């Protein structure tokens, strides 16, 4: 009887792990100015969410660097434009820009970086996106962030 109870408990625990929300995503970037996804979905049950950015290309960050910035969709282009003068040392982001929800640093070939942010910063009725703020990259390197 005890063995059955233990077995049932373990199966219940294991199935709970299978259905737990995945509160992390890895996004790859390339020398062809692209991310490997156009959409990031965040489960409402996540307290925090982590985005890991990798760069599978061969070029250094000063030539083909990438970062990943999360903001409201309406703020994406203004953030990228305002960040141009900040330069690579500040990840092409204006210092203290509170329109930025989260961002990784600019990385080059073979590098990776991650950022973890509080999901409570996102509202269900707002549209969010992600993009690369390296000059000129936002035109091809962007996608949606959805709270589901």
Curated annotation (Swiss-Prot):
One of its GO terms (molecular function) is copper ion binding. Disulfide bonds join 23-46. Keywords: Copper, Disulfide bond, Electron transport, Metal-binding, Periplasm, Signal, Transport. Cu cation binds at residues 66, 132, 137, 141. SUPFAM superfamilies: Cupredoxins (SSF49503). Residues 1-20 form the signal peptide. Pfam families: Copper-bind. One of its GO terms (cellular component) is periplasmic space. InterPro entries: Azurin, BlueCu_1, Cu-binding_ET, Cupredoxin. GO terms for biological process: electron transport chain. It is found in: Periplasm. Residues 21-148 form the Plastocyanin-like domain. Transfers electrons from cytochrome c551 to cytochrome oxidase. Monomer with an intramolecular disulfide bond but can also exist a dimer with an intermolecular disulfide bond. PANTHER family: AURACYANIN-B, OUTER MEMBRANE PROTEIN H.8. This is Azurin. It comes from Pseudomonas putida (Arthrobacter siderocapsulatus).
């Amino acid at each position: 009887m005890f063995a059955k109870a233990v077995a049932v408990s373990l199966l219940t625990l294991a199935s709970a792990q299978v259905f737990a929300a995945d509160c992390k995503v890895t996004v790859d970037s390339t020398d062809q100015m692209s991310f490997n996804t156009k959409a990031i979905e965040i489960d409402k049950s996540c307290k925090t969410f982590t985005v890991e950015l990798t760069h599978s290309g061969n070029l250094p960050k000063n030539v083909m660097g990438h970062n990943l910035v999360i903001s409201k969709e309406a703020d994406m282009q203004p953030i990228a434009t305002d960040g141009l003068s900040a330069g690579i040392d500040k990840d092409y982001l204006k210092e203290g820009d509170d329109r930025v929800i989260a961002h990784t640093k600019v990385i080059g070939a073979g590098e990776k970086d991650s950022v973890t942010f509080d999901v409570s910063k996102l509202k269900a009725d707002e549209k969010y996106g992600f993009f690369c703020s390296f000059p000129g990259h936002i035109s091809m390197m962007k996608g949606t962030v959805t709270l589901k």
